[in-house]
């Protein structure tokens, strides 16, 4: 038998149905047909599809698709009932014909129709009147294997919002940029993804340098009770070891510990977290014990006495759920018996992940500063706008008050917890809800009128002493977690920080919360929250764009109310497989370094010009160019394949990846006592 003959296997029955749907992780069958080679310009039949009643001719013999996909081409305006028109190309300063990337700055730009391949890469974040892609760009994408988004016929860029927390503000902001919202959480062709609850799928499919993703993967180092406690303890141990080095920097800084007043201590200029005094954990964080560790649990049960009140909180809860006070031995004994019974339960040992949530007990501050007899705390914001390099900001928030008068011995949690969820349980909430939230200006006026002369406070104490103290505490917490935080270009986070002031005007950090509440159910919140969200997104987009291009971060044109705490351009540079290395971000020299080898291309002297980086210390992998989110004040758009004028012969897209992010699922904002 001749085995060289080709054998054909025929299937019986009707032919296999061609599915037009999209299966995740695989290309649709309708897109696997051979592409027609395009030479010169794109045929008019591709740019001007024939009406549905008069099907047009096939673009090339032998490649005429059949079925619904041919009758309604993917990505064409025919599906949306729009008239197909050729794109209007725009010419930049270099004569390059391409899409308009300066829509927000060019008022004269003429908008074009949705393009066939406009979703190949997200458009400019500030582009509200962007023109459609030119024919030359479409041809280049076709020859290069570009294809439209298999999910939608609209051009994009796309954004996804998971949950309702701040969704209206975020959606309005993105739509004002010309972005379009998607509602499928499984899609990975987004430019911005903002979710209340973290999902490992989001981090697994995240494309560094191409997308923006809200919440750092391991922000639990700061935003859970146990995470924050462990982070601060680790920082304290490191500082203790450093202080024992004779003549060390920390040893000299520890000499300032006996300073009588914190406001008299020196503090460096904003933007560089190099405090001249090391904070001690016990100075701003209440004494706390972990109940999931036996030795800490037993230590707490031993030291407890009825002269102090303690508060027990789950490590990652929200809305005050699971919080209760410990005032007497009976309540502590009940808690001790419950923890022991759970520890002895064999089911808990077999499936510890199904056990109850870990808890902490924290010394309750019994002497809070009162406002008209009511307890209050201050919500401020820590913004991580960029992680490569780190750009950290402080933002003012508002004051939250209880409706009930403060009584330390009361069993009503509404008089102890200031969050809106607890206050809504009061029957008087709808009548007095405007009294549960104060602006920082209102709080400053009250403290100045009530305590300024009587207590000898500084003028405008809220905006001077309190502001500086909160910035110092935030800086300390960030520096403690910084070596362990996952950093990739495109990660950003907005963290809510809750501070309590006691009657001695000492400031305490209660907790830090992921996914802070962005609701606007009060007039003060309607004034504060939108500004916080809008400036957050503005700073995220600007720092992302500058980091991608390798430009200097400062000045930041979108910075308004947020205060810069840390500019990480001098920090260790991220590398493959980790969050930091010994490399630093390349300096910004005023003249080119001498070299014995062949001369290197000279970068023009303009803002953002940088010297080519030295050879990498670790193997690097190329990264595809991300979305061009620039605006007109940052320079003209570059042609595909060209270099940025401010980066020498090194393209900013060739940055190393900082490694794989840890994946987890967290609950939204924690409760705030």
Swiss-Prot record:
Residue stretches making up the TTL domain: 155-552
Record-annotated membrane-spanning stretches: none
Record's compositionally biased regions (Basic and acidic residues): 89-105, 661-673
Listed Gene3D superfamilies: ATP-grasp fold, B domain (3.30.470.20)
Basic residues compositional bias, start-end: 8-36
Composition-biased stretches (Pro residues): 52-62, 612-627
GO process annotations (BP): protein modification process
Binding site for ATP: 362-365, 375, 377
Function: Inactive polyglycylase.
Name of the featured protein: Inactive polyglycylase TTLL10
Species this chain originates from: Homo sapiens (Human)
Gene giving rise to this polypeptide: TTLL10
């Amino acid at each position: 038998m001749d085995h060289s003959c080709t054998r054909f296997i025929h299937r019986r029955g009707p032919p296999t149905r061609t599915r037009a749907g999209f299966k995740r992780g695989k290309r649709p069958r309708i897109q696997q047909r051979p592409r027609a080679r395009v030479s010169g310009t794109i045929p008019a039949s591709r740019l001007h599809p024939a009406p549905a009643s008069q099907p047009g001719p096939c673009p090339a013999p032998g490649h005429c698709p059949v079925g619904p996909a041919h009758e309604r081409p993917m990505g064409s305006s025919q599906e949306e009932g729009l008239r197909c028109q050729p794109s209007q190309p725009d010419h930049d300063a270099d004569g390059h014909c391409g899409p308009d990337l300066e829509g927000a700055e060019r008022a004269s730009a003429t908008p074009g129709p949705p393009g066939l391949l406009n979703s190949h890469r997200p458009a400019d974040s500030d582009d509200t009147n962007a023109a459609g892609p030119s024919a030359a760009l479409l041809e280049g994408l076709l020859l290069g294997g570009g294809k439209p988004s298999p999910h939608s016929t609209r051009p994009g860029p796309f954004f996804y919002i998971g949950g309702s927390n701040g969704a209206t503000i975020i959606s309005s902001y993105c739509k004002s940029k010309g972005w379009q919202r998607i509602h499928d959480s499984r899609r990975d062709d987004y430019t911005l993804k903002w979710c209340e609850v973290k999902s490992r799928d989001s981090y697994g499919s995240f494309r560094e340098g191409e997308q923006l993703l809200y919440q750092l993967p391991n922000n639990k180092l700061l935003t859970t009770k146990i995470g924050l406690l462990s982070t601060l303890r680790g920082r304290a141990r490191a500082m203790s070891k450093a202080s024992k080095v004779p003549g060390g920097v920390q040893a000299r800084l520890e000499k300032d510990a006996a300073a009588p007043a914190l406001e008299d201590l020196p503090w460096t200029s904003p933007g560089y977290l190099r405090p001249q005094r090391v904070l001690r954990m016990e100075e701003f964080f209440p004494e706390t014990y972990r109940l999931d560790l036996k030795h800490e649990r037993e230590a707490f049960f031993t030291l407890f006495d009825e002269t102090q009140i303690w508060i027990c909180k789950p490590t990652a809860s929200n809305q005050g759920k699971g919080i209760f006070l410990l005032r007497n031995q009976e309540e502590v004994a009940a808690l001790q018996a419950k923890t022991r019974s759970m520890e002895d339960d064999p089911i808990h040992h077999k499936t510890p992940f199904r056990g109850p949530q870990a808890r902490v007990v924290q010394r309750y501050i019994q002497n809070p500063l009162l406002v008209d007899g009511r307890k209050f705390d201050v919500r401020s914001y820590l913004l991580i706008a960029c992680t490569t390099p780190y750009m950290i900001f402080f933002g003012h928030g508002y004051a939250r008050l209880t409706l009930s008068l403060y009584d330390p011995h009361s069993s009503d949690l509404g008089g102890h917890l200031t969050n809106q969820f607890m206050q809504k349980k009061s029957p008087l909430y709808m009548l007095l809800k405007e009294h549960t939230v104060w602006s920082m200006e209102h709080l400053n006026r009250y403290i100045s009128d009530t305590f300024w002369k009587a207590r000898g406070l500084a003028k405008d104490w809220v905006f001077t002493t309190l502001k500086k103290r909160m910035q110092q505490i935030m800086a300390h917490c960030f520096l403690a977690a910084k070596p362990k935080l996952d950093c990739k270009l495109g990660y950003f986070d907005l963290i809510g920080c809750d501070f309590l002031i006691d009657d001695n005007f000492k400031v305490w950090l209660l907790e830090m919360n992921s996914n802070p509440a962005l609701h606007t159910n009060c007039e003060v919140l309607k004034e504060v929250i939108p500004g916080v969200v809008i400036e957050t997104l503005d700073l995220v987009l600007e720092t992302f764009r500058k980091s991608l291009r390798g430009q200097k971060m400062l000045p930041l044109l979108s910075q308004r109310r947020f205060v810069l705490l840390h500019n990480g351009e001098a920090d260790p540079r991220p590398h493959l497989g980790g969050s930091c290395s010994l490399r630093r971000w390349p300096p910004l020299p005023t003249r080119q370094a001498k070299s014995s080898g062949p001369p290197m291309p000279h970068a023009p002297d303009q803002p953002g010009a940088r010297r080519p980086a030295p050879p990498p210390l670790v193997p690097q992998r190329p990264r595809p160019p991300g979305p061009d989110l620039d605006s007109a004040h940052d320079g003209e758009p570059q042609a595909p394949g060209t270099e940025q004028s401010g980066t020498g012969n090194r393209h900013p897209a060739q940055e190393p990846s900082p490694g794989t992010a840890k994946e987890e699922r967290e609950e939204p904002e924690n409760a705030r006592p």
